[in-house]
Curated annotation (Swiss-Prot):
Cross-referenced InterPro entries: NDUFA12
A GO cellular component annotation in the UniProt record: mitochondrion
The protein's name in its UniProt record: NADH dehydrogenase [ubiquinone] 1 alpha subcomplex subunit 12
Keywords: Acetylation, Electron transport, Membrane, Mitochondrion, Mitochondrion inner membrane, Respiratory chain, Transport
Subunit (UniProt): Complex I is composed of 45 different subunits.
Function as written in the Swiss-Prot or TrEMBL entry: Accessory subunit of the mitochondrial membrane respiratory chain NADH dehydrogenase (Complex I), that is believed not to be involved in catalysis. Complex I functions in the transfer of electrons from NADH to the respiratory chain. The immediate electron acceptor for the enzyme is believed to be ubiquinone.
Modified residues (N-acetylmethionine): 1
Length: 145
């Protein structure tokens, strides 16, 4: 009897993602295969799911889009791809998703969501105003013989 329940749950996993191809796609991209109810989709194409049978902290998740702001994100998924309005719901700061209760507009939130630029040439590097404790040695300049 328990074997039948495991097989039934496995078939639900495969059929819930659109067949074997969709199942493998989600498995390789997210390293986790879960089935839940679709709560909503943001303007970039990220899909947000919820399953209250899971324990707290793993009952809400996102399936990221394959392209965002002109960048191919199929294998390059980043947590900064979640817009602020969905971040509130995803991290359980609110029970109402933005599809039910839209958040209030804030002037510090961008209209077009940006990626995390850390580790790229566009990253923010603050100017250092303190003097170095150790200075680099500069060899005396002599002509090469």
């Amino acid at each position: 009897m328990e074997l039948l329940q495991v097989l039934k749950r496995g078939l639900q996993q495969v059929s819930g993602h659109g067949g074997l191809r969709g199942y493998l796609r989600v498995l390789f991209r997210a390293n986790d295969v879960r089935v839940g109810t679709l709560v909503g989709e943001d303007k970039y194409g990220n899909k947000y799911y919820e399953d209250n049978k899971q324990f707290f902290g793993r009952h809400r998740w996102v399936i990221y889009t394959t392209e965002m702001n002109g960048k191919n994100t199929f294998w390059d998924v980043d947590g900064s791809m979640v817009p602020p309005e969905w971040h509130r719901w995803l991290h359980c700061m609110t029970d109402d998703p933005p599809t039910v209760k839209p958040p209030t507009a804030r002037k510090f939130i961008w209209t077009n969501h940006k990626f995390n630029l850390s580790g790229t040439p566009q990253q923010y590097v603050p100017y250092s105003t303190t003097r170095k404790k150790i200075q680099e040695w500069v060899p005396p300049s002599t002509p090469y013989k």
